[in-house]
């Protein structure tokens, strides 16, 4: 296989905003914590043939650094502190932290090192894998086909919402990690900027260059790591929620609910957390059932749901977002994050269903037990059983 002609990535900021948000919190609170993360392809795609090309891109990433104009732009945002930004200015990717192998056609990737550094690999590495694979599989597809597909979807969207008050509909681009390419994501986002309901992107590089609002708070790994950082497994989720508020007391306050199922989350999400966090993010399970649970929980606590925001981001497309908007718009604030269905929605192109997830913290196992059984990730079945027991969950799902 011929190697990719040039580096896929051109900016340290070509990543999701929540990576920097979490990295700052790790820098301040968990500087010496060590982690391991692993790549997983949820489909049967045999991606091992791309291992050499991926390794070449990983090696090229060590040359990325925060540029002066990027540093100044980040300095103007309200939640970054000077000590972290000065450290980030010196940050370089360390390719020695990444082991990429072809295991009889299966792509294996394992990341190890300090959490403050390893945290940066996931999103750009997934974007690299996605772009490389699509480059070889669909060499004739690109920006034109992506924009044509988007225009068709926008025509349908306009018809679907013709009789709706769309003043409270807010859409965000969450498409970095599984995009067809960097150029396609930029073209899609620039087109969506023309729509009044488009409010921002999770990609810090695009947000800076296109003068958009960067979107994102924290990911599953924040909660997973606390399973070993916290001295008590049963209180680890509350410890994660409290530590986030310690770093960001009055901003970036959307909490992810499905690291250990929504029901377990709500048991930990008492009046103080519910009051201080601005809202919740859905990332697995039935979105309507989840939203109803969230609203009922706020009401039970005496909190007006209209003062809170629900963010939906699980496998969304525009019609699904409209359906959820119809259902919830009069009862709660809403935002919708769409990823693959925007940035890799091209006829005859199959998006990759790929993730990189934390599997260890300080040498011990961590797990994600989401509201979708197929998304459960952990090597250690004994730890999964312990986690389920600690959070009073039935012992029914197997770790994948």
UniProtKB/Swiss-Prot annotation:
UniProt cross-references to Pfam families, sorted A to Z: NAPRTase (PF04095), NAPRTase_N (PF17767)
Output the GO biological process annotations, alphabetical, semicolon-separated. NAD biosynthetic process via the salvage pathway
- Keyword flag Ligase: yes
Q: Which residues carry this modification: Phosphohistidine?
A: 220
GO CC annotation: cytosol
Q: How is it modified after translation?
A: Transiently phosphorylated on a His residue during the reaction cycle. Phosphorylation strongly increases the affinity for substrates and increases the rate of nicotinate D-ribonucleotide production. Dephosphorylation regenerates the low-affinity form of the enzyme, leading to product release.
What EC number(s) has UniProt assigned to this enzyme?
A: 6.3.4.21
| Keyword Zinc-finger attributed | no
Which InterPro entries does the protein's record reference?
N/Namide_PRibTrfase, NAPRTase_N, Nic_PRibTrfase, Nic_PRibTrfase-Fam, Nicotinate_pribotase-like_C
Which molecular-function annotation in GO is an example for this chain?
Answer: nicotinate phosphoribosyltransferase activity
List the catalysed reactions.
Answer: nicotinate + 5-phospho-alpha-D-ribose 1-diphosphate + ATP + H2O = nicotinate beta-D-ribonucleotide + ADP + phosphate + diphosphate
What is the enzyme's main class? ligase
Q: Which SUPFAM superfamilies does UniProt cross-reference here? A: Nicotinate/Quinolinate PRTase C-terminal domain-like, Nicotinate/Quinolinate PRTase N-terminal domain-like
Recorded metabolic or biological pathway in which this protein acts? Cofactor biosynthesis; NAD(+) biosynthesis; nicotinate D-ribonucleotide from nicotinate: step 1/1
Q: Which UniProt keywords apply?
A: Ligase, Phosphoprotein, Pyridine nucleotide biosynthesis
Which protein family is named in the record? Belongs to the NAPRTase family.
Report the function annotation for this chain. Catalyzes the synthesis of beta-nicotinate D-ribonucleotide from nicotinate and 5-phospho-D-ribose 1-phosphate at the expense of ATP.
Protein known as: Nicotinate phosphoribosyltransferase
Q: Which organism is it from?
A: Salmonella choleraesuis (strain SC-B67)
Q: What is the lineage of its organism?
A: Bacteria, Pseudomonadati, Pseudomonadota, Gammaproteobacteria, Enterobacterales
């Amino acid at each position: 296989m011929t190697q990719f002609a040039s580096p896929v990535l051109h900016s340290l900021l070509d990543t999701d905003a929540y990576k920097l948000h979490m990295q700052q919190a790790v820098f301040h609170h968990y500087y010496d914590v060590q982690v391991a993360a692993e790549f997983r392809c949820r489909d049967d795609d045999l991606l091992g043939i791309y291992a050499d090309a991926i390794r070449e891109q990983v090696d090229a990433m060590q040359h990325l650094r925060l540029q002066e104009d990027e540093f100044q732009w980040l300095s103007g945002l309200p939640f970054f502190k000077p000590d972290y930004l000065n450290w980030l200015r010196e940050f370089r990717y360390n390719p020695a932290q990444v082991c990429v192998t072809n295991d009889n056609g299966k792509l294996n990737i394992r990341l190890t090192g300090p959490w403050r550094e390893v945290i940066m690999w996931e999103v750009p590495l997934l974007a690299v894998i996605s772009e490389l694979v699509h480059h070889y599989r669909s060499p004739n597809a690109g920006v034109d086909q992506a924009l044509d597909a988007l225009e068709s979807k926008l025509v349908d969207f306009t018809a679907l919402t013709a009789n709706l008050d769309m003043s409270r509909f807010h859409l965000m681009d969450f498409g970095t990690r599984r995009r067809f390419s960097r150029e396609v994501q930029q073209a899609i986002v620039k087109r969506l900027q023309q729509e009044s309901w488009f409010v921002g992107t999770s990609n810090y590089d695009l947000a800076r260059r296109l003068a958009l609002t960067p979107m994102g708070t924290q990911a599953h790994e924040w909660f997973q790591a606390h399973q070993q950082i916290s001295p008590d497994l049963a209180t680890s989720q509350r410890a994660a929620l409290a530590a986030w508020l310690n770093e960001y007391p009055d901003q970036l306050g959307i909490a992810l609910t499905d690291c250990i199922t929504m029901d377990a989350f709500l048991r930990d999400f008492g009046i103080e957390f519910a009051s201080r966090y601005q809202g919740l993010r859905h990332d697995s399970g039935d979105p309507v059932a989840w939203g109803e649970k969230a609203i009922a929980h706020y009401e039970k606590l005496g909190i007006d749901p209209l003062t809170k925001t629900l963010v939906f981001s699980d496998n969304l497309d525009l019609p699904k977002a409209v359906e959820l908007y119809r259902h919830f718009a009069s009862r709660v604030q809403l935002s919708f994050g769409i990823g693959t269905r925007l940035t890799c929605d091209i006829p005859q192109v199959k998006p990759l269903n790929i993730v990189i997830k934390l599997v260890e913290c300080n040498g011990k196992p961590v797990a994600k037990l989401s509201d979708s059984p197929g998304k459960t990730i952990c090597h250690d079945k004994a730890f999964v059983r312990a986690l389920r027991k600690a959070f009073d969950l039935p012992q029914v799902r197997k770790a994948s």
